Amino acid sequence: MVLPKALGLASICLAVGVAACNPQISGDFYSGDVVDVLETDKPVIVPMRLGMPIQNEKKCEEHKNKMLPALERNSNNVKFLNCEDVQGNMYDLVNVEIDAETVKGMDVGDGQISGMFGARVAKDETNRAEIIFVKTPKAAKAIKEIDALYQFQSIELKGIEIKIRLNNDLRQAAQFVAGSSYVDGRPIDREASFELKRRAFIEVVPSNVRSQSLIANGQSLFGVLLLD
């Protein structure tokens, strides 16, 4: 059965499942940034793409005007990209670019991340560099502000879809340890190590469990970087 997007986002989410209407985050992460943050204690800023589900991209200007002010108040360097007609799905997207900070620290209170999303990196007891994704309270604040502008539907942050391309821009090879994720389209249950030669990259999509941890706990392990 094909459902028209005009049914509205709330009906769409109910019809096809909540996960289908989650915000989407994608972008590039660099092993060199992990090393820089660990060595200098200074944050590194990288642009990330944030896709916010909407009912219909044909009403782009209306959705853009509702969402952008809240995102600008709670994120850094917000740039509107486009409204995307997501073929084959019951929703479309407002795509924006936001700055995401990578800071040094292992605990939730370590390192100041000023936007909605970011990452913390720290060496564990075996000297491995853990990469932890972070959702700050500003994410919930932005969603609440956007929700207040929609009269007949609820905008809630119940899940999030993440897709990251991890690039090795170092002069030497590195190992990335991932678990509970899809790596280059392959489902990885237990921890597995992937070699990243110089200038190589892999695409990592964390599982729903890790995404839900990010929503519920404000943080989720992305993976571990081992350097030669």
Predicted regions and their residues:
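Edge/loop elements at the starts and ends of beta-strands within beta-rich repeat scaffolds
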Residues: 35-43
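Bacterial signal peptide processing site
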Residues: 22-24
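C-terminal motif of bacterial Sec signal peptides marking the signal peptidase cleavage site
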Residues: 17-20
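Mature, soluble, non-transmembrane domains
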Residues: 70-228
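Post-signal-peptide N-terminal segment of Sec-exported extracytoplasmic proteins
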Residues: 43-70
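Short, low-complexity, disordered segments immediately C-terminal to signal peptides
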Residues: 26-35
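Bacterial N-terminal signal peptides that target proteins for export
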Residues: 1-9
